[in-house]
UniProtKB/Swiss-Prot annotation:
Protein name per UniProt: Cytochrome b
A Pfam family that the UniProt record links to this protein: Cytochrome_B
UniProt source species: Pteronotus gymnonotus
Topology relative to the membrane: Multi-pass membrane protein
Intrachain S-S bonds: none
Family: Belongs to the cytochrome b family.
PROSITE patterns: CYTB_CTER, CYTB_NTER
Note accompanying the cofactor annotation: Binds 2 heme b groups non-covalently.
Quaternary context: The cytochrome bc1 complex contains 11 subunits: 3 respiratory subunits (MT-CYB, CYC1 and UQCRFS1), 2 core proteins (UQCRC1 and UQCRC2) and 6 low-molecular weight proteins (UQCRH/QCR6, UQCRB/QCR7, UQCRQ/QCR8, UQCR10/QCR9, UQCR11/QCR10 and a cleavage product of UQCRFS1). This cytochrome bc1 complex then forms a dimer.
PANTHER family linked: CYTOCHROME B
Encoding gene, per UniProt annotation: MT-CYB
Main location: mitochondrion
Purpose: Component of the ubiquinol-cytochrome c reductase complex (complex III or cytochrome b-c1 complex) that is part of the mitochondrial respiratory chain. The b-c1 complex mediates electron transfer from ubiquinol to cytochrome c. Contributes to the generation of a proton gradient across the mitochondrial membrane that is then used for ATP synthesis.
């Protein structure tokens, strides 16, 4: 008799995605981050749901409601810090996941890659709106500065900003709508994840060698289920240590001061995971130019499949391209550091050089390195 998981209409979908799915036998631990992201999303939705039960999205009470969650609600403090630091874990996994896609040429599956870029934008939007909700100083001023960037759009900019604010400044209407969108977006992200997986399972997973692996596959269960569970346990251990030992390590102390429109913090900066984009934004002295560079710093991922000039898919056997990739990683770390520094010499010039280098590596140096490798291999 055929097993029910192979015949039942619903279980069959789960079976084809998580049990009998053929996976290349050579995939390494870098392929674990997809499942880690799913675990992060689950943690964020669960903790967020319980936080939303006690949070009030009103400028008069938002800050106090977060304080109330931490002080008076049973295990409220752990929910709040799991949610805040869970976002950091989410972005660590997200950036590694994108990096793995770049390194091993996973972007050649263009539909999966493009849905992934859409997911990246959605997660960034969700994280930004979530940062506004505690209504501390950095929440208020971060919201003011970042939404104000839209005023750089010619002709409709000012009207667009006031439409988003729901008034002439960031106020009650802004906070209420940000809470509504922050609650809604994770479910849209979950739906996009299903589409992402749908496209992935159309082609099958890539592998470190970058060559077709049809003759050499293993079933997803038990090999990769065990591997994924180990990865999830390691990530949850790291998250627990962060939450229990230094919950405010990645936060900003200014956010423990209630929002005050009359008092500007000395250094307005976003959470650490946006600092690289913030540094690119600040490195251009023109407002519209900065906004364009900010958007393009992420949107540039969409042109990477078009810039693939190598005859090989993966970077595993391409030392020149590997050098370019790790130079890009170092450059992004430099930008992250610069984004957290004040706007003064020498940080300004370092930021400008790192920003130019970021676009140069992706648009020029990586395709050139690939062409050189083709030539060296006489292809």
């Amino acid at each position: 008799m055929t097993n029910i998981r192979k015949t039942h209409p619903l279980l069959k979908i789960v079976n084809d995605s998580l049990v009998d799915l053929p996976v290349p036998s050579s995939v390494s631990s870098w392929w674990n981050f997809g499942s880690l992201l799913a675990a992060c999303l689950a943690v964020q939705i669960l903790t967020g749901l319980f936080l939303a039960m006690h949070y009030t999205s009103d400028t008069a009470t938002a800050f106090n409601s977060v304080t109330h969650i931490c002080r008076d609600v049973n295990y409220g403090w752990i929910l709040r810090y799991l949610h805040a630091n869970g976002a950091s874990m989410f972005f660590i996994c997200l950036y590694i996941h994108v990096g793995r896609g770049l390194y091993y040429g996973s972007y050649m599956y263009s539909e999966t890659w493009n849905i992934g870029i859409l997911l990246l934008f959605a997660v960034m939007a969700t994280a930004f709106m979530g940062y506004v909700l505690p209504w501390g100083q950095m929440s208020f001023w971060g919201a003011t500065v970042i939404t104000n960037l839209l005023s750089a759009i010619p002709y409709i900019g000012t009207d667009l900003v006031q439409w988003i604010w729901g008034g002439f400044s960031v106020d009650k209407a802004t906070l209420t709508r940000f809470f509504a969108f922050h609650f809604l977006l994770p479910f849209i992200i979950a739906a996009l994840v299903v589409v992402h997986l749908l496209f992935l399972h159309e082609t099958g997973s890539s592998n470190p060698t970058g060559i077709p692996s049809d003759p050499d596959m293993v079933p997803f269960h038990p090999y990769h289920t065990i591997k994924d569970i180990l990865g999830i346990l390691m990530m949850l251990t790291a998250l627990s240590m962060l939450v229990l030992f230094s919950p405010d390590l990645l936060g900003d102390p200014d956010n423990y001061i209630p929002a005050n429109p009359l008092n500007t913090p000395p250094h307005i900066k976003p959470e650490w995971y946006f600092l690289f984009a913030y540094a690119i934004l600040r490195s251009i002295p023109n407002k519209l130019g900065g906004v364009l560079a900010l958007v393009l710093s992420i949107l540039i991922l969409a042109v990477i499949p078009l810039l693939h000039t190598s005859k090989q898919r993966s970077m595993m056997f391409r030392p020149l391209s590997q050098c370019m990739f790790w130079l890009l990683v170092a450059d992004l770390l430099t930008l992250t550091w610069i984004g957290g520094q004040p706007v003064e010499h020498p940080y300004i010039i370092i930021g400008q050089m790192a920003s130019i280098l970021y676009f140069t590596i992706i648009l020029l140096l990586m395709p050139l390195a690939s062409m050189m490798e083709n030539h060296l291999l006489k292809w």
